[in-house]
Each structure stands twice: as C-alpha cells, then as structure tokens.
Amino acid sequence: MSALFYIVLGLTIAVGGLKTWDAIWSFRAQTLADYAEADTPALKDVLGRTFQAEGVIYDFTGRVKSRFNARIVGAFDDAGGTLNEEFVYASGAVDRREWSIRFLPDGQSFTATAPDVIGEGEGKITGDAIRMTYRLQLPERAGGHVLNVVDWLYLLP
C-alpha cells in the first residue's frame, strides 16, 4: 500500500479519536439530563430575585479566556420578566445586559432577547442547572465578532 494511504488512515483515526474524546470527556459533553435527579424549581423563583454569580469564559478550545463576577437582578411574573446583569471582569472591564425573558408553557423552557443578542436565545432548567444558548454580538472594542454562546448556570443553596 502507498504511504499516502497510511497518512490518510492515520489522520482519520486521529480526528475520530479527538472527536470521541471531546464528545465523551470534555466540558462540552454535559447535558441537562446530567442534573435531572435534583428537584426542578420554578424559573420565576430562581430568576426573580437579586443574586451574585461568578463565571468563567472559555474559548473554543476549552481554555479560560476571562473570569468575572456578576450582580443579577430579576423581576418576574408567571409569563416572564427581565434579568439585569452587571459583569465585572478580572481585567476591570464592566459590561451590562438586560434580558427580556418569556417562559414557555412547559414551565421549564424559556426564550430570551437582549440588545446585543442576535435573534432569540433559548434556555431550559432541569434540576439545579440552567442551560441557555444564544448568538452574542461582541462590541467593536472586542472585535465585533458574533459568538455562539452556551451558558450554564448552576443553582447553589
């Protein structure tokens, strides 16, 4: 057999191995089903208050790009409400975002919009975890890129 065949075979095995590793053992492998054993509280009870959050932003390779603290103030009724966030990053930069959130009939899912979000974000609570996906338009000072964001929020006592 030719050397080219073995090179292609080796690359195929390597790529397949990396994809398997990523799907099974990386932080991207988690799903909401992983948190289903805990009781699922009502979204308005979880989000409809003032709370503090700490977070980490990862790049596409899984490396930490930034850390932040956030103050989050929610005001909700049975249909939805607003979530005001103020982020203070390790660099000292400050960002603010106001989400408009609409609860869906299943009681666990929601849609969300914000001025710097393209279209609608989608979220769901299961057990003590909330997962939300959306497309974020970065400000020009940060390059103006559009990011596909997957936010995980973990509820602590």
Residue ranges and their predicted role:
Residues M1-R63:
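Amphipathic/hydrophobic helical signal segments and adjacent flexible N-terminal regions
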